Amino acid sequence: MKVAVLLGGTSSERPVSLVSGEAAIEALREKGHDVTPIDVGPDIATTIASLKAAAPDVVFNALHGPRGEDGAIQGVLEWLGLPYTHSGIRASAVAMDKGATRILLAAAGLPVAQGRVVTVEELAEADPLPAPYVIKPVAEGSSVGVEIVRTGDNRRAEIARTWRFGKEALVESFIPGRELTAGVMGDRALAVTDILPSETAAFYDFEAKYKAGGSRHVVPAELPQAVTDRALDYALRAHQTLGCQGASRTDFRYDEGTDTLVILEVNTQPGMTPTSLLPEQAAYCGISYPELCDWMVREALAR
């Protein structure tokens, strides 16, 4: 079939999207599809013209970050009447808003860390939570802008002064322990991965995610079966609660000392290089990377 692959974009995650998109293009061509790459820039009219010229049967969305996974490009594709992979407008917009995601997940009985959305002015005045706590942009991905304020740390006011991610921030209690993630394909939770940042990484930040040697992935995670089952259940329920479609990935923190497992976020546009977390989990389940990409476009077309 004719597939247009959207990649690039204008967010801070553009380099990640380019890698994901190029890998998907190669995989889809391997599966026999007629693929047209479309590098999405700041001019949406140019993107629309490229989509109309390509006249695809389906669009593979390999964009990340604002405008790519927040419902914006999804709205354009809906307006054009083009089927597309991953989640729709509402789920994409909600999942991109970490504050809104927290509210919906908690209402569904799913575990989230103690926290709230604060203004930058509030953050500048006083600690919003007892340290240690995490400060996150409300609408960024790939751990862009994430800061950890630890006990005795005097960086809070400076973080607020130099904040460049809007007028608000999400603050959450820091959960010690392990970084876990679980992917979902349709109505199936795949596997749980244990993410081990390098010894030089403070946490699983942008460099740990994308720099060579920045982290190591262990799939399946070496966990008690009950914890694995809980993570898989939470990932599928989070996918369903937000109304996600296609593939998603839910990230967790797990404190072994207290047996506490909390959801950090739900990714409606998970990384899609062959060595990204979701494709690794699919491979563990016997689904090759080309088969995963092929499933995504066929699932989108069948909705």
Swiss-Prot record:
Q: Which Pfam families match?
A: Dala_Dala_lig_C (PF07478), Dala_Dala_lig_N (PF01820)
Q: Which cofactor does it need?
A: Mg(2+); Mn(2+)
Annotated SUPFAM superfamilies: Glutathione synthetase ATP-binding domain-like, PreATP-grasp domain
- Write out the residues that bind ATP: 128-181
Q: Which reaction does it catalyse?
A: 2 D-alanine + ATP = D-alanyl-D-alanine + ADP + phosphate + H(+)
Q: Name one GO cellular component term.
A: cytoplasm
- Where is this protein chiefly located? cytoplasm
Spell out the Gene3D superfamilies in the cross-references. 3.40.50.20, ATP-grasp fold, A domain, ATP-grasp fold, B domain
Record key words, sorted: ATP-binding, Cell shape, Cell wall biogenesis/degradation, Cytoplasm, Ligase, Magnesium, Manganese, Metal-binding, Nucleotide-binding, Peptidoglycan synthesis
Q: Which GO terms describe its molecular function?
A: ATP binding; D-alanine-D-alanine ligase activity; metal ion binding
- Name the positions where Mg(2+) 1 binds: 251, 265
Q: Which InterPro entries match?
A: ATP-grasp, ATP_grasp_subdomain_1, D-Ala_lig_Van_CS, D_ala_D_ala, Dala_Dala_lig_C, Dala_Dala_lig_N, PreATP-grasp_dom_sf
Q: Where does Mg(2+) 2 bind?
A: 265, 267
- Keyword ATP-binding set for record: yes
Report the PANTHER family cross-referenced here.
D-ALANINE--D-ALANINE LIGASE, D-ALANINE--D-ALANINE LIGASE B
Q: What does this protein do?
A: Cell wall formation.
* Family note: Belongs to the D-alanine--D-alanine ligase family.
Which HAMAP family does this one have? Dala_Dala_lig (MF_00047)
Q: What is this protein called?
A: D-alanine--D-alanine ligase
